[in-house]
Amino acid sequence: MKIKKATAMCAVLSGIMFGGAMTVSIPASASSKDQVTIYLTRHGETTGNVMQRVQGSSDFPLTKNGIEVANDLGYGLKGIRFKHAYTGNLTRQEVTAQHVLKYSNNKGTKVTTTPKLREGGYGSFEGDSIAADNQKIANVYGYQDGKEFQQATGKDYWNKLQDAYYKLDSENSQNTNLAKSDRAESAKQVQKRMSSELLHIAKTTQKQGGGNVLVVSSGMSINEYLSTMTNKYEGKPMQNAAVTKLVYKNGKFKVQGPIGTLHYVNKGQKIVADK
């Protein structure tokens, strides 16, 4: 399946007075050392991924491969000190973070869980076969099938997919008795909570002097968030344990490097292979 905003740096003025150099430092609310770098990461492979199920807010555990890729990511991130780690409150996200921290030598780093970082909710469709739902989703927008829908919508695919679940569940197309609060989320709802939480994390870390933060979330929610905050976003599927670096500086987030890179996983796999 196919995700935009940090403080002013000290200004330094240099002048010439009476033939000599004079440097005047003007303090600001934060300096360059207060920069925050968030390693926004998708969880490792789950049983739901393998079975091609709609996961959302439902709890599917990591597979053996999912644990191994989380370990590989950890090895690939060795040398990076994480001041804090945050995850959604789903087992697949929490366990991924634990393994990444362990194998990157950050085992003592505190982990905070929050529902704001969980996957997009799909309400009555949770646990469904993705293949079985594809036709229903495509029909919402007048497409023949899921493949045509994805090709036609391009980088908007993930948001439209989320909104299709929201529309269908709002209409109770599955004929369930779910409460409104348990039904599918819209893309805007996912984007709002992701954006709010990531900004909170960045500001909190900045007040503590800046540094690196590991954040583990899920593919759809990451894609939906990134689609709102950078023109680098292309809507490509977010692979398991893929990382997107977000730098928070001068009051804004900026994507640093590629979106959804497997660089750290590949680096970790090489380290393991060379042991």
Question: Each PLM stretch: what is its role?
Answer:
Residues K2-K4, V12, M22-F82, L90, ...:
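An N-terminal RHG(E/S)-centered segment typical of histidine phosphatases
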Residues A8-F18:
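Hydrophobic helical h-region of N-terminal Sec-dependent signal peptides
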Residues S31-V36, Y122-A131, G209-G211, N223-K275:
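Acidic, low-complexity terminal tails and accessory targeting/binding regions
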Residues G44-T47, T91-Q93, L117-G121, M220-I222, ...:
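Solvent-exposed loop/turn segments at secondary-structure junctions
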Residues K64-N71, Y75, E94-Q98, K188, ...:
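Solvent-exposed, polar/charged alpha-helical surfaces in well-ordered, non-transmembrane soluble domains
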Residues G74-N159, G235, Q239:
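Phosphate-coordination/substrate-recognition cap region in phosphate-metabolizing enzymes
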Residues Y141-Q189:
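Short glycine/proline- and acidic residue-enriched helix-loop micro-motifs
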Residues D182-G235, N240:
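Extended, basic/helix-rich recognition subdomains
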